UniProtKB/Swiss-Prot annotation:
Entry's Gene Ontology BP terms: chitin catabolic process; defense response; polysaccharide catabolic process
Native organism taxonomy: Eukaryota, Viridiplantae, Streptophyta, Embryophyta, Tracheophyta
Catalyzed reactions: Random endo-hydrolysis of N-acetyl-beta-D-glucosaminide (1->4)-beta-linkages in chitin and chitodextrins
Protein name: Endochitinase A1
Family: Belongs to the glycosyl hydrolase 19 family. Chitinase class I subfamily.
Source organism: Pisum sativum
UniProt KW keywords: Carbohydrate metabolism, Chitin degradation, Glycosidase, Hydrolase, Plant defense, Polysaccharide degradation
Annotated GO MF terms: endochitinase activity
UniProt key word Hydrolase: yes
EC number of this enzyme: 3.2.1.14
Enzyme class: hydrolase
Induction comment from the UniProt entry of this chain: By infection with the fungal pathogen Ascochyta pisi.
Protein function: Defense against chitin-containing fungal pathogens.
Length: 15
């Protein structure tokens, strides 16, 4: 939920 689920959340970013 921290990384990848939100836009530009992580690597790779989802938005």
């Amino acid at each position: 939920e921290q990384c990848g689920n939100q836009a530009g959340g992580x690597v790779p970013p989802n938005g």
